[in-house]
Amino acid sequence: MLDTLRKRLRSEKGFTLIELLVVMIILAILMAIAIPSYLSFRDRANRSAAGADLRAVIPDVEAWFSDHGTYAGMTPALLKASYDQSINTTMYTITSLSATTYCVQATSPNDTTKTAAKKGPSAQIVIGATCP
C-alpha cells in the first residue's frame, strides 16, 4: 500500500496550492517595488520634459518681441515653438504680458509647473521665477 502511494505521488505532476501562493506573493512583492519606481521615473521625465519645452519656447518669445517690439498680444498658439510636439503633453500659459515683461508657465501632466519670467526690458530671463 505504501509503495502504491509513493508511485501515485511520483506520477502526479503539477504545482501544489502552497507553491502557487508562494509565487503569487513573490510577484506581489516585486510589483509593490516596481510600480512606485516606475511612477516616480515617469514623473521625473515629465518634469524634465516640461523644463526642456520651456527652454525651447523662450527663444520664440524673444523672437516675437524682436518682430513686434512688445510682448503684448503674444499667445501660445502664435509661438512657433520647437518643443517636442510628438508627445505634446506640456500646456503653456503666458501671463503678465506688457510691452517689456512676460511670464511663461509650462505645466506637465503631473501638474508640475515650471516658469520663466522677464521683468523689464534689460532684465535677465529667470527660470523658476514666480509669476504674479
Residue ranges and their predicted role:
Residues 14-16, 47-60, 66, 126:
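Extracytoplasmic/periplasmic mature domains of Sec-exported, cell-envelope-associated bacterial proteins
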Residues 1-15:
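N-terminal leader/signal peptides at the extreme start of proteins
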Residues 12-38:
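N-terminal single-pass transmembrane signal-anchor helix
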Residues 8, 37-54:
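Aliphatic-rich helix starts adjacent to a transmembrane/signal segment
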Residues 59-132:
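Periplasmic/extracellular, small/polar-rich flexible segments of pilin-like filament-forming proteins
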